[in-house]
Amino acid sequence: MLGAALAFAVAVVASLGAEPAAARAQAGEGDKGERLMNASCQGCHGVRVIQVQAKNAEEWSKTIDAEIARGAKVAKEDIPVLVDYLVDHQGPLPDGRGKAIVLNVCTMCHDLSRIRRGRRSPEEWEETLNAMLNEGAPLGDDQFPIVHAYLSRNFGVE
């Protein structure tokens, strides 16, 4: 029984964001943005630096301009594609208690689009967080209720 529940929880979490990503991949949009990020950004630093910033389009544009000034190789016509990709996958999250934990813990395995699209009831967020703990997420006992409240408040069922 526990094995079936765990398998279900893992399947639910794995399905978060699968359909939109597949649709983008068919259109080739997400692929190009990801390729640009891998080639242009990760040549100097790892993806972790990107994952914890949660910037909007204007902020990502400024960051890219600053990185180009430091020597990053991004063609002018590729900047909007890269910005769109970063906003979609590493874009802004609502402010509030728990945001920093989500950025530092959840993004170790998930991009922010997956978190933003994961509309769930408080009970479903609790199940999801417990499933992630079972998978090895480094979420402390004191952090669990904070993250649970943040996700339930900001990414609840609409």
Language-model features: locations:
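Bacterial N-terminal signal peptides
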Residues: G3-G17
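Extracytoplasmic/secreted proteins, especially bacterial periplasmic and envelope-associated proteins
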Residues: K32, L36, E59-K62, V81, ...
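The canonical Cys-X-X-Cys-His
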Residues: N38-V47, L82, L103-S113, V147
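N-terminal, post-signal-peptide region of Sec/Tat-exported proteins
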Residues: R48-D78
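Short Cys/His-rich "knuckle" micro-motifs
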Residues: Q51-A54, L93-P94, R116-R119
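Short microdomains enriched in Cys/His and/or Lys/Arg
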Residues: S61-A72, E126-L139
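Short, amphipathic C-terminal "tail helix"
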Residues: V147-G156
